[in-house]
Amino acid sequence: MSSGRIVQIIGAVIDVEFPRDSVPAVYDALKVESKGLTLEVQQQLGDGIVRCIAMGSSEGLSRNLEVTGTGAPVSVPVGNETLGRIMDVLGNPIDECGPIGEQERMPIHRKAPAYDELSSTTDLLETGVKVIDLVCPFAKGGKVGLFGGAGVGKTVNMMELINNIALEHSGLSVFAGVGERTREGNDFYHEMQESGVVNVENFKESKVAMVYGQMNEPPGNRLRVALTGLTMAEKFRDEGRDVLLFIDNIYRYTLAGTEVSALLGRMPSAVGYQPTLAEEMGVLQERITSTKTGSITSVQAVYVPADDLTDPSPATTFAHLDSTVVLSRDIAAKGIYPAIDPLDSTSRQLDPLVIGAEHYDVARGVQSVLQRYKELKDIIAILGMDELSEEDKQTVNRARKIERFLSQPFHVAEVFTGAPGKYVPLKDTIAGFKGLLAGDFDHLPEQAFYMVGTIDEAVEKAAKIAGKAA
């Protein structure tokens, strides 16, 4: 075990001098025993000096403090003992429920699986959310991104997906909270307890492991917490299980990288991001993959700064995903939730050979009606509905019904809306939209389609509205 001394401290970045014959490797963990702080080596500057980022607050550090090399990267607990527990970036428990008691620890830095170990699948993962299952279906073992600006519902959508998939799919989940609100992490933990996914009495019966590096943490924690969660998911995958990995929020991972990059003295690139943005994103995303042993299905929330999808951070993330769910402020402004844009959201699974001709035709039919309505909006704004042809009037009426039918009450939003949540099976979703496109429900009022589950509920709601009017 080599030991060195701190020679410089700039915020979260700390330079440590070691004897020249025992300089630690890049990504090695170093310990400041007197402060209980872990550092991670980022650069070797020469002359025995290494530049590190602190995995915690650097307050109270001073020059000449002794630092010990561990000779290995940061390692975290893995395996069944992590289930039901909340851990920080170093794998320490933060839920006040005693030690983890792990049998095994693994380093957070690993190589991605080799090309010949990868497996691809075209099995669909039903989410019970109509708009997702219809226009941007998820693949089992695929990667999904939830893109949206501030306050359009990324976290609520993710919570609903956790509720629907993690409860319906009896497998294991790992939740990594990267630079998000502590309050949301707390709410999530209590919701998981209420739904039985976390069993505090008997952790062995829990189905989710949680790793948090929240907004108030130093950039080193936020930068590495995604890797900590991923390492736990990889262990479950390598045991031959199907794992769900939820990351909220990938943008904060990029942002932590930007903060660290500037402190490490790198020249910034476009919009002030780190020059290694694509590489850092690739290192994380290439490890989130399914192998012939087991699968990782990941759902990642991606904050879009100033609603600009061309910003380098979301733009870099797009390349790695199988399905992109884009949340729109315009749709949220209409009161339609989930505020998912059916024209902007895409999926590689939307192919007749994968999902079948009927599903494909209905999805494309819905998109073409909504696209035509979008084109007609300018004409309607200037000349009004009366100037449209009969065919266009019919398209507009159907599009407005489809728009409303894409809304749905969520289980996790029940406390706010008072409306019980709905899980809609895929076959019911396809049947409902097929009927709308065929004109079977042209006689029903628009409001009957708002915030209902299946088409039968819309018909019931229309009857109630008609009864009240009478």
UniProtKB/Swiss-Prot annotation:
It catalyses: ATP + H2O + 4 H(+)(in) = ADP + phosphate + 5 H(+)(out). Its EC number is 7.1.2.2. InterPro entries: AAA+_ATPase, ATP-synt_VA_C, ATP_synth_F1_bsu, ATPase_a/bsu_AS, ATPase_alpha/beta_chains, ATPase_F1/V1/A1_a/bsu_N, ATPase_F1/V1/A1_a/bsu_N_sf, ATPase_F1/V1/A1_a/bsu_nucl-bd. ATP binds at residues 148-155. It is found in: Cell inner membrane. GO terms for cellular component: plasma membrane; proton-transporting ATP synthase complex. Keywords: ATP synthesis, ATP-binding, Cell inner membrane, Cell membrane, CF(1), Hydrogen ion transport, Ion transport, Membrane, Nucleotide-binding, Translocase, Transport. SUPFAM superfamilies: C-terminal domain of alpha and beta subunits of F1 ATP synthase (SSF47917), N-terminal domain of alpha and beta subunits of F1 ATP synthase (SSF50615), P-loop containing nucleoside triphosphate hydrolases (SSF52540). It is a peripheral membrane protein. GO terms for molecular function: ATP binding; ATP hydrolysis activity; proton-transporting ATP synthase activity, rotational mechanism. The keyword Secreted does not apply. The keyword Acyltransferase does not apply. It holds the Pfam family ATP-synt_VA_C. Produces ATP from ADP in the presence of a proton gradient across the membrane. The catalytic sites are hosted primarily by the beta subunits. F-type ATPases have 2 components, CF(1) - the catalytic core - and CF(0) - the membrane proton channel. CF(1) has five subunits: alpha(3), beta(3), gamma(1), delta(1), epsilon(1). CF(0) has three main subunits: a(1), b(2) and c(9-12). The alpha and beta chains form an alternating ring which encloses part of the gamma chain. CF(1) is attached to CF(0) by a central stalk formed by the gamma and epsilon chains, while a peripheral stalk is formed by the delta and b chains. Belongs to the ATPase alpha/beta chains family. HAMAP family: ATP_synth_beta_bact. This is ATP synthase subunit beta.
